């Protein structure tokens, strides 16, 4: 398994950030994990450091993450893997985000253990 994977978790919900951080720590060797709580801070963090994976919530303060947000991020950071993370309906939204460049979509009520493993396999 790849060591030192750099992950940015962008979600305004502290519990969701803690859960996902714990799962990444469980399944990865020595991951570097940073967290942001709004879209402005997410862009600022991306501008300061290179990440392997961005776990991006759709509904956040200072602007929601639309498919265009994914397009904009990928234009600046083409190697960055983006996974959407939302309580919104996956079936409706996932195709739009995948078409925009995201590699996955986790709905918050899904089995996060399984989804996290699948995402790690995709990123590695």
Language-model region placement:
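Two-component/phosphorelay signaling modules centered on CheY-like receiver
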Residues: 14-34
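Non-catalytic signal-transmission and effector/linker regions of two-component phosphorelay proteins
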Residues: 1-8, 113-124
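The short loop immediately C-terminal to the conserved phospho-acceptor aspartate in CheY-like receiver
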Residues: 59-61
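Alpha4 helix (beta4-alpha4-beta5 surface) of REC/receiver domains from two-component response regulators
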Residues: 89-106, 110, 114-117
